């Protein structure tokens, strides 16, 4: 993304529409959002961006999906990782982007997954 340009990522539940992430160009001068793309994902209940700004991670009904953030702000799917049936409600990376933390909504548990340098999610640690 070029300096001075902003992109917003909005996650949502999907009922009748399979696009759970919407990507918006942000016009800071006029305070407007313009939808530029949408991503097919089921019930993207929460998302986070890695500390290095290169990757986006989203919780789904079935686990966590990893995306590369392209120079124009679009997203490219890297991979998916299951979280053993846990229904995640929060996702975050550590400061070095080596681990992904997923907090459980119903059970209050925390699942930790290892991350590779390319942003892909490995198995639960």
Spell out what each predicted region is.
Residues 34-40, 76-82, 125:
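A short beta-strand motif characteristic of beta-propeller blades
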Residues 24-31, 67-74, 112-124:
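Short loop/turn segments immediately following beta-strands, especially the blade-tip
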Residues 13-17, 63-64, 106-109:
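Short glycine/acidic-enriched loop and turn motifs that connect beta-strands
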């Amino acid at each position: 993304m070029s300096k001075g340009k902003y992109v917003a990522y909005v996650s949502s539940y999907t009922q009748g529409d399979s696009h759970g992430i919407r990507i918006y160009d942000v016009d800071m001068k006029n305070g407007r959002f313009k939808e530029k793309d949408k991503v097919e994902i089921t019930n993207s209940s929460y998302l986070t961006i890695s500390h290095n700004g290169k990757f986006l991670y989203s919780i789904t009904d079935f686990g966590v999906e990893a995306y590369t953030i392209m120079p124009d702000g679009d997203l490219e799917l890297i991979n998916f990782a299951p979280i053993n049936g846990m229904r995640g409600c929060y996702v975050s990376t550590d400061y070095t982007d080596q681990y992904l933390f997923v907090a459980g909504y119903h059970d209050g548990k925390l699942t930790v997954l290892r991350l590779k340098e390319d942003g892909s999610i490995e198995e639960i640690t």
